[in-house]
Amino acid sequence: MVKKNSKKAAQPATIARNKRATFEYKFDEKFEAGLSLMGWEVKSIRAGKINISESYVMLKNGEAFLHHCHITPLHAASTHVVCDPTRPRKLLLNRRELDRLAGLVERQGYAIVPISMYWRKGAWVKVEIGLGKGKKAHDKRDDIKQRDWDIEKARVMKNK
């Protein structure tokens, strides 16, 4: 009799990706941060009603906040709770990580941008944030050329 393996290595289920961030920024470091959410926000995220393409991270009073992350409230949301779709949401990071981010952003001109949002262990929403600098126009053109060349290479290899 074969037993099912209950301890599978569960892949994190991606909720949203910020493709624009990977095109606009070159990331030096990436961090995983928890997200402080209300009940209606979790329900909306489970329904897939989230957009992080315009969002960014701000540091204020030693804490990190995710701004302009648009979570559309469901129609069946509670009537006694005011649903603000773009409210700033607190990111849950260690003090050491917050201090490192603050130092690099203030001194060296780095930006903190969310890269993706995913489920961890089925119930926790995590945000992958990247610490990086903006790309110049020629860097973006190089990325486009490289991507086109990779597609062309794959096409040629497939036909052989």
UniProtKB/Swiss-Prot annotation:
It is found in: Cytoplasm. Its main location: cytoplasm. Pfam families: SmpB. Keywords: Cytoplasm, RNA-binding. GO terms for biological process: trans-translation. It comes from the Bacteria. One of its GO terms (molecular function) is RNA binding. Disulfide bonds: none annotated. The keyword Cytoplasm applies. One of its GO terms (cellular component) is cytosol. Required for rescue of stalled ribosomes mediated by trans-translation. Binds to transfer-messenger RNA (tmRNA), required for stable association of tmRNA with ribosomes. tmRNA and SmpB together mimic tRNA shape, replacing the anticodon stem-loop with SmpB. tmRNA is encoded by the ssrA gene; the 2 termini fold to resemble tRNA(Ala) and it encodes a 'tag peptide', a short internal open reading frame. During trans-translation Ala-aminoacylated tmRNA acts like a tRNA, entering the A-site of stalled ribosomes, displacing the stalled mRNA. Belongs to the SmpB family. This is SsrA-binding protein.
